[in-house]
Amino acid sequence: MVITETVYNMLLRALHVTYTPDEDTEQRIRAEGAAGKDLLNRYADPDADCEPGTRCGQLLCDYVMRAEAGAAETFLVDFAQDIVETKSEYDARIWAAGKGYTEAEGNAETQGD
């Protein structure tokens, strides 16, 4: 899985990288970002793009910071509540879409009724 330039730049900002990373560092951060995005898509929200300003974007930053510290294996345990909440929101969104609800309509209107 590949991360976008926007997501890569978000990760650099989260890691406080103020220099131009060398090729090895860039590849490592991109690989960690891709692994984190894959994990979040698998366990939290399959549709998440992990863009800046989103819950999954912040979770991805947290994952990459853990990975950079050599502690990526602690992520699922330490952020379990956030992952479950994100998964619940995804499931509710899919359920609502299946019932004909749309986000723009608000909370109690359906299409075609």
Model-inferred region functions:
Residues 6-10, 28, 78:
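Exposed alpha-helical structural elements
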